[in-house]
Amino acid sequence: MNAFQDFELGAKLYLQCLLSLSSSRSATPSYTSPVNHAGASPLNAIAHSPVNVSATHRQNFFTPIANQSQQQQQQQPVAVPLDSKWKTTPSPVLYNANNNSSNNNTSSSNNNNNSNWEVGSNSNTHVAATAAATSTVGAQPLPPQTTPVSLVMHAPPPQQQPLQQQHHHHQPPPPPPASLPAPSAPPTSGSSSSHNSVGHATSVIRISSSQQQHQQQQQHQQQAHPHVVVSGGQTFHPVIVDATQLSVPLPPTTVSFHQPNTPTSTAASVASMSQDKMLAKNGYNAPWFKLLPHMTPMSKASPAPVTPTLTTSASSYNVVMMQQQQQHQQLQQQQQLQQQQQSPPQMPLNHNNNHLIVSAPLSSPGKPLNCSMNDAKVAAAAAAAAVANQRQKQQQEEPDDQLDDDVFETTTPGISANSKKQTAAMRLPTHNSNIRKLEECHDDGAAGAPATSAAKRRSQSLSALQQQQQQQQQAGAAGTAAGQPANKKIRRPMNAFMIFSKKHRKMVHKKHPNQDNRTVSKILGEWWYALKPEQKAQYHELASSVKDAHFKLHPEWKWCSKDRRKSSTSTATPGGKASGAAGTGDAKQRLVSVDGSDSLEHDMCPSTPGGSGSCGGQGISSDLQGDIIPLTIDNYNSTCDEAPTTISMKGNGNGKLMKNELPSDEDEQMLVVEEEQQQQTVKKIDLHCRERVNDSDMDDTPFDYRKQQPEANQRSAEEHSTSGANGQAINAPPLSGGEREITLKPKAIKAHPVLESNMLPYTQMSIYTQYTSPKNPIGVTPFQPTGGAFKSMPISPKGSGGKPEDAGSLQAHIKQEDIKQEPPSPYKLNNGSGSASGGGVVSAPPPNSGSVGAIFNFNVPTATALSQKQFHYPMHHPHRSPTDLRDEEADREEITQGTKSGESSEKDKPALDDQERDEVEEEDEDEEDDDEDDEDDEQFMQELASVNASAGFDDLVPYAMPKVVITPTPTPPPVATIVTPIKRKQFTIVRSLTPLQPSNSPHQQLKHLHQRRGETPPTVITRVPTPTINHFTIIRTQQHPHTHPHNTPPPLFFKQKVQGSPVIATVTTSTLSSSSSNPANNEAPNKFSNFPTQHQPTTTTTISCNTNNNATPIIRKLLTLQEGAELGGSHKGTGRAAILYDALVLDTLHGQDEEEEEDEGNAEKQENPKVAGKEQVTTSQPATMLLITDVNAYNQQHVAGNAATPVSGAATLRPVSFISINACNKITLPANARILTAATATSTAAGAAVTSQAGATLTVMTKASAATNHSSSNASDITITAASAAPVPTSGSSIVMINSTTNPSTSSNSTSCSAAAHQACVPSSPAGMGLGHAANIATPPASAPAQIMGGGPASQKMFFAMTHPYTLLQRSHQPGTPSLEHLQLDAFAPGGYTLRNHNGLSSLPPPVSAQPTMLLHGYPPSHGVEPPARSPSYKSMPSTPKSATYLMSAPPERGMDGGMSGCASAAASGGDESDIDADGQQFILAPTPAQLGRAPLQRRKNLSQSKSESNVSFGANLGASNGQHISRKLHSPTMMESSSPIIGHVNSSNLSSALPTPTSSTTTPNSDEQLPLTPTTSSSNSNLNQQQPKSPMKGAPGSTAAALKKKNDEMNNSVLKQVDFEKKYKALPQFQPEDCQSPSAIAVPSSPRVYGTNYRKKNTAPPPVQKLMCEDDSIDEPASAPPTTTQRFFGPDFNNELKELESSDQTGRSPRTPKTPLQSARSDASEKGHRKVLETRRSLVLQLFAEHGNFPTAQATMAFQSKHSDVFPRKQDLQLKIREVRQKLLGQASCTPHSAGPNTPSDSNSSSTTLSASSTSLNMQTTSAADVFQYY
């Protein structure tokens, strides 16, 4: 180990030197192939040794040059592990490598660069070291490697010295290098291959910032001879050649350098390594500084080609230490390699060679030191010293070697510190070609981000900059990660045009509404261009004064926007960039790093490597530096440089570190890992690394906190480092903490490092690419942004897949805390859950469950999240696993006889779900996320199915929380999840299918929520994905008045009025109908609508009674999946997320649930007696019954016998996800199932007529109705009137919510048979609901969540008038009885509406009574009124990530707001839609991509999550499809009166959490509020939810943004105040567009529409356009005078009018961006040809739209594509063009908001509705429906 340590020290020194040199030289042997890197023999490594070292530091590789045999020896031992690891993780990110510490390190570096770099192992001795050393890590881009400083150490172990020499001999021949590059390319994929060239070095390790350093360290430590270690280059990329080869170790190398004898060299290097650690502490300053002096000459001396000298290229330093003998050969080889590599992209080796051979490039020490300025100086000095001392020290070698190593170590601190800066620079360089870009420096606060950059770009000395940065960061920004970014983020002063834009943007928006920002900016540019010089002068004057004031205030400020952007990008980017992790925090971190370098130069020099590179504190760094380079690495790429050393030091620990690095940006990971590593060497490193890495990279704060702790830790870490693998990981992070203050600033993005780290391991997240791919088996955590804006966002499902449990639990943990919003808010629960579980990730595919949840996490109610967490089988103690579920099923059997049915249903459901998913996928083909979602959903469904089978509902422990926030958890898939109320405390969750989510998260979330709320979180029915059609849940109406001690007043909207538990009669078409008749399904909705219509009066009556009686109407929150699973396959797709739980309802249920959970056995039974007196029920009857039955299973079991066997059907129906109302607090209604607040008549009719109509429909009546019929049986019993239902399988399944009073008799009659059976199934079936889930109902309509909120008096009224989610969408059912259909749609919307009415109106009950009619919705009236406001939000909601998709499932949503989108909704509320459109015309800006959750980052997060979430989001949105109006209606009405505050609260808190992403609207079941994407949503919500929703809404999306903006503004306020900005600003001249002489400036066609002159000529529109232009003031001028480039900023072709004309023009021309002045002249034939193709495609797509509507079905799309395969060779081409054209068309529509929201949702809805809609929607397409779904 001493030898290795020496080597490590030497390696560190070399790395430092190389960093100083800042050129990455792939030394000799590089690992051969990414896959076989371990397997690759040293020869292979050597063969691939040359790595391009290009300006991009990021990819610097430093490969030790060792003879092949040496490498083989060293590599081989570890080769196998590495190989396997690498093979396991071919990608550069070697998360797997973490398994073997050495492998991990190497892998880490590989992982960091997203190319597959092979890690070649040089070291024989230590596996970890070998892994690090042997593994050659390819950096993403070879060029980046050039940038990073590379240290080439050739210090083979004594035994290997001869080999090394031989190796050198081998190397010298050009052929090997020549061949090497090629082989390297093949072995490594992508950049990997070029990096393989780097592979020449025995080990080229591309180490991510921290990991790389660790790896290198490990390599040095572990390898007797250091091979060239190529660091990812993100920090600094040292190339460590065998000690022998490195015979000129910079200081340490020097020893090796002079000593030709490998043994001595090796010993020296090993000694140096060991000493390095020790010297790191002792010799940092003195040796370092000594080295610096040496280095100075050295850098100048570096040119010596033959002598291994440290040569510094302009961009980077390469310190190459070679034995003199080998040097020659090496130099020759290197030269050859250099040539080869230079010619190829692979320059690392070349650079190394260059440095060795060609000192000219390397000779410029200042810049070569890419480290901070100080680093550069230090590096230069070090290089000079190294060169000068190389020979001297070589001679001195042994003792000096160690001293040199120490010096080098010191250098490492110094250079390493510099290196760190360099590393940071390198990392940045890795990101960017240049080693350290000032930006990076800036970004950096970056250790090396811009050593060279700093040299190049910084006006101030690094030290000054660093000091300033440190001061600033430490001052306040450094204090908190979040705080830091704000402080650290100094907005650049506004220039004249920015001020002008600020002043006129509103005017432009006013003048040219509905223009995208790009066009608006162009118009502003035109205006500015037209502004008179004297007016412009005033702007310039003000701008210059602002700038002066700015620089006075921030003298250190540099405008490195590009670098900053890149660094942040890199951060966001997969670890491919060493600083990627640092990226987000990178800018700050790098800056810190730079500061660190400076500090290093000063006292901190020693610590710099750690501190500046990775360590938070320089001091810490210095301590650790010698000992723990990894610390440095952890924090930064610069750390990376040292990381290898540290790695060797840490040896085994490193591997883990590598993993961590890989997951997060290398730096982050290293940091995180290090701390974690000490704690958890391997396993935890992954997770912790992810977490910690995130913390370190993303959040300086965590490190800042640790910094102070960690300073001690750093020392201990140093010691650990010294000791070896122990403290490496942990110590490194502390170091980071210490210096990190500055460095960590960028981390501010992370919300709470603690939470975040707990929540999700950022390290994993850091590399997005690795989410679930084999590349990062580690289970890279999906990216979780931590900015205030993202706090509520769920982790990306991608990453969490790897470690669902950890991620989930962490996530849940953090999310809970993060999401702490108002505890009472159900959404909060949801949020917490969603956020925490990633989860709300119910929709998350099982694999990603933890991170699932795209932005919509919040959508999923806590229950969902919980369920997700529970999904995680580990977490699912109540339901341990899908298999366990069956056991639970047994439990459930106690509750319900239908367990078997449930199981089979579950099984069926998965199939259905899959089908649905497939359908949905087809439907949503246009939707990018949908496919994934579908897949995820399928998985989820399957899992759910497994889980569903046994829904053993534990008796929930009733909590005495008056407002149990039951967060509605939409079930992502339409799988009927068994919602088993796991102890209420924990939350009753339907067992989630996503096992990935750690089980703890759901519980934790619930607990947190409980703690927060002080109320037990409502048992949240985890998202109950009802299998589309088959699964329907009966809403359990809970009566808060229920005698239950815990009975809380109906939370949210259920007020005492609603106390009487409403009877819900759910009539679902039996599966029979679903399977036997899709038409029946379609028909069913019609019938249902008819039926409800028939029974409307009764309903009204009932409602009145119920409203008064039932304090808590049945949970309105009905998570219904699309009904179409079996029925109209189309419904299925919708169904998956269709289940929405009304958070309010949930709350209500929770209040009741608590009662009922306690009483699940009791309360329900009590309810039975109460039910007996249905009217009595009003007081005590908690009519909360959730019966989620797998209709599919039921149907499948009773395919034709549903009607025939009502009772058995009931048993079968035994809700797979039978959520007893109390247990689930949420009801998942099948899409078909409509809960109508039909009065007795409805109930009766519903039970009888509906059932008959619905065909095997089960009527689940509330206890009251059940009581009437089954008063003896127990109100609890859920009566499934299978027989009644069976008779009319054809009718769409409808859930009739019957007033407890009226319906009971009829309902009970129909339902009596099944009631008993169901009762068995449902622990508390007091609701006495008849579940008739025909296939139609089985598919829970997305809109199924009909609010059965008592609303006011008509609380009972909440009906889920969702016969079919699609059916609803498809007004086709309505045709027969459009009013009913409308009603149903309205039921959804009205549910929401009803709630709304309830909220706003007690009259809602009348509407409800009118419910059968569309009016009930208020679709025309109520809906029309409210939807308009909502419609935009709905629209936006659908447009939210998968909201649109969910919309499919949200026919109600369509019906509701843009429900129009939904066919049924459109049909039913077609008028409404128009109203909304017209109404909703209220101009609402189209949601931004971020709001829609479509921003790249969100998209990444949502990829998997979105898929599952698309289901969830549906439900979660409650506003999305179902949820849209339902969530609004459900939520708002539910919460309206009593719970309005809650909802408001929920909304506000949820919004806050949800806020981060518009999806948050979907995220929180709160739905509409969260739909907050659009103002309408907020207004609608506020309407429904009274003031609160609005505030929350506004607060939500706006508040976070506003808060952030506020912070930023505050930053500028001081500057602006100094300038008296406001006064002067107001005095500025106002531009008068009329005065504008640039016609185009006035006319504002959207820029994209503007065509070149050629097009204009082609178009008939041009003359009018010109006329239009002429109409404008100065039209004549441009027209008359030939347009000159100077005349108009955007050129003659830019004119808004033209754009407008052309947009209206249906010629099918594709829009083109405005041409620059010369563009039209440039349009040559080739361009024309291309344009012609584009135009052809556009016209064809328009043709397709004309034939099939804006949302053509998958079948239509495929057929069209095959028909026009010449134009659309691939289906993707057509889909993309469809999406593009549709977006343009919708964008042009006057109702942008509406289009954006409802249409998009309708798009996804339509996709899912396509199936159901195909049957139903076709029948009944009202105006809106026709418009939206005519294509179906």
From Swiss-Prot:
Entry GO CC: cytosol; nucleus
InterPro entries xrefs: CC-Dev_Transcription_Reg (IPR052412), HMG_box_dom (IPR009071), HMG_box_dom_sf (IPR036910)
Nucleotide-binding among keywords: no
Tissue and organ distribution: Expressed in the central region of embryos. Also expressed in ovarian follicle cells, the wing imaginal disks and the wing pouch.
Keywords: Developmental protein, DNA-binding, Nucleus, Phosphoprotein, Repressor, Transcription, Transcription regulation
Induction, per UniProt: Subject to local inactivation by the RAS-RAF-MAPK signal transduction pathway, which leads to relief of target gene repression. This pathway may be locally activated by a variety of ligands and receptor tyrosine kinases (RTKs) according to the developmental stage and tissue. In terminal patterning, activation of tor by the locally processed ligand trk may promote cic inactivation specifically at the embryonic terminal poles. In the developing wing, activation of Egfr by vn may lead to cic inactivation specifically in prospective vein tissue.
Residues where Phosphothreonine is found: 1716
Localization per Swiss-Prot or TrEMBL: Nucleus
Acidic residues compositional bias, start-end: 397-408, 915-938
Composition skew (Low complexity), residue ranges: 96-121, 187-203, 211-223, 323-342, 446-484, 1092-1105, 1462-1471, 1547-1589, 1800-1817
Compositional bias per record (Gly residues), positions renumbered to this chain: 610-619
Any GO MF annotation of the entry: DNA-binding transcription factor binding
Region (Interaction with gro), start-end ranges: 834-1832
Compositional bias (Polar residues): 409-422, 1078-1091, 1503-1525, 1789-1799
GO terms classed as biological process: dorsal appendage formation; dorsal/ventral pattern formation; epidermal growth factor receptor signaling pathway; eye morphogenesis; imaginal disc-derived wing vein specification; maternal specification of dorsal/ventral axis, oocyte, soma encoded; negative regulation of cell growth; negative regulation of organ growth
Keyword Repressor on entry: yes
PTM annotation (Phosphoserine): residues: 41, 49
Pro residues composition-biased segments: 172-186
Domain of life: Eukaryota
Regions of compositional bias (Basic and acidic residues) in chain numbering: 903-914, 1724-1733
Annotated region of DNA binding: 490-558
Its biological purpose: Transcriptional repressor required for the specification of numerous cell types during embryonic development. Required for terminal patterning of early embryos. May associate with gro to repress tll and hkb, restricting their expression to embryonic terminal poles where they initiate correct development of head and tail structures. Required for dorsoventral patterning of oocytes and early embryos. Cooperates with dl to repress zen and other dorsal specific genes within the embryo and promotes expression of the ventralizing factor pip in ovarian follicle cells.
Subunit relationships: Interacts with gro.
Listed PANTHER family: HMG-BOX TRANSCRIPTION FACTOR BBX, PROTEIN CAPICUA HOMOLOG
Protein's recorded name: Putative transcription factor capicua
Native organism: Drosophila melanogaster
Gene name for this UniProt entry: cic
